[in-house]
Regions:
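Two-component system phosphorelay core
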Residues: 1-113
Length: 113
């Protein structure tokens, strides 16, 4: 039933992930998220090339940076990426990469004063 499907898409996305961030960070958040998108692309190409060391370093940086900006989920994923890279666990790396991609595509910033 296509009308039900169309109706589903018109609803405000229940699949969005709201993240509450202090409004004083509003100027730097778009850049932070753009950098994570770039990390995503870098990690994908590093996985293809087997460059786990770069993934480990990016994961470590995400782990350190995420929480400071209010993105605890990015810190968690960064930690998972770092550990999986150190363990040479490619299937886990693919899973965590998917998790990061999913989070970035669904995150919705809610600025709080």
């Amino acid at each position: 039933d296509t009308s039900a499907m169309m109706h589903h898409h018109a609803e405000p996305g229940p699949d969005k992930i709201p993240v509450h961030i202090d409004s004083s960070l509003e100027a730097i958040i778009p850049g932070f998220l753009a950098n994570r998108q770039r990390d995503l692309t870098t990690i994908e190409s590093c996985l293809k090339q087997g460059d786990l060391n770069t993934i480990r370093m990016l994961g470590h940086r995400m782990k350190g940076d995420g929480g400071g900006y209010g993105f605890d989920q990015i810190s968690v994923i960064g930690d998972q990426l770092e550990r999986a890279a150190m363990a040479h666990n490619l299937s886990a790396l693919h899973d965590h990469l998917k998790g990061l991609k999913d989070f970035l595509s669904r995150v919705e910033i809610v600025y709080v004063h």
